[in-house]
């Protein structure tokens, strides 16, 4: 875990349409996902591990990842999924 057991959450999300247009459920997914990303230097774990850590089904986890990727909040990289602009924000 890089730089301690915390992550940055910027007040700018109040005016970010990508964030503010999320459903309450997807906002919760997004917050939990960025917490998981922090534990792995920005990269998300495999779906099976994410589902277990978040106490969700693999199906619901996959759907949430698809939704957040479509919203522009997750990027597909050659190493896996990563929150958009992770390096700039963390």
Each predicted region: which residue ranges?
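Detector for short helical micro-motifs
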Residues: 1-90
